[in-house]
Every structure is written in C-alpha cells, then in structure tokens.
Amino acid sequence: MLVVLLTAALLSLFSMYVIRGSVLKQATDDSRSDFSSQIVRVQKHLNASNLTGTDQYQQLVSNLASELQSNGSSNLVGVYLMERDAADSAERGFVPVSTEPEYSNLVSSSMRNRMRADTSGLIYYQPVRIPRTSGGTPGAVLGSVISSNNMGSLEVFALYSYQSQQQALSQIQINMLMVCVALSVLIG
C-alpha cells in the first residue's frame, strides 16, 4: 500500500511539473505572438508617418502607445516606448511614453543594453515578477527595436502578466492533491 501511495505521489509531482511547463510555454508563446503582431503594426505606422517636428513625433509615439495597449491581448499590463539612444533624444526631445508607469522599472537596463547592440529587430524576452501581490505575479517583459527613416529608432516594450496561468496551475495543484488524498483513502 505504501508503494502505491508513493507511486501516486511521484506521478502527481511529475504530472504537475509537465503541466506547469506546458502552461508556461503556452503563455510565453502567446505573449511573443501578440507582441510580434504589435511590432508589425507599429512599424507600419512609423513607415506611413510623415512628420515635420518634435511635437508631431511626440504625439505619434503617444498614439502608438495607446493603440498598442488597447489592441493587445488581455494579459497585456503596460506598453513602454523609449528612444534608442541619447543622441536621437537630444535632437528630438522625445519624452518616453508609458501606459502603466508603475511598472516601468521592470524594463531592465540589461535588457535595454542587449537591445542596443541589436540591428536585426529581434524580440527580447525577460521573465519578471510583477509586484501586485506578496511574492509577485509572474510575467514577462518583451522588447524590440523598430525604426523609421525620418524618426530614427524606437524601443518598444510590453509587460505581460501570467496571473491567470498561475491561478490555473494553483487549481490544478489543488485538484491533484484532492485526487491523491481520495486515492489514499480508497486504498488505505
């Protein structure tokens, strides 16, 4: 009987590990897909823009941030648009735009440094803890660089929350625990 209980417990732990990995991979893939489509949308807007001054540039960046936030997936927490380098900033006087300034510190300097070295438009991923609750909510910051001939380069970041996936995993853990208890009662 003890062997059966230990086997059931080990199978439950292994199943939880596999399920957790699968759920987190799906959440990551969904975030990357959403962010990729958002980047394509922003790049099209930049390519179509014909700006003549700093005020127009600032207005476009603000509009892009609002559009990205409203068209993003349901787990999109915030959008952050920043200039790529200080030289461009001095020329245009661009003020960074954020739809959720409370979490702008989650865009790390190490991620920005990796992106500064990029010239191929890759999408960067950084897991984070969003300080909403004690212990934080799992999430991720995704970032990429887009550019336009008349405006230079723009760093685009998006913060995604994995709170719903975390809740689903907690419910699965509770259900598996209940099954183990029921199994031990039936066997014992």
Regions found by a protein language model. Name each.
Residues 1-28, 148-188:
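Alpha-helical transmembrane segments of membrane proteins, especially the N-terminal anchoring helices
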Residues 7, 28, 52-54, 99, ...:
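Residue-identity detector for threonine
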Residues 8-9, 27, 48, 65, ...:
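A sequence-composition feature that detects small, non-aromatic residues
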Residues 54-129:
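Extracytoplasmic ligand-binding sensor domains of the Cache superfamily
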Residues 106-173:
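Extracytoplasmic
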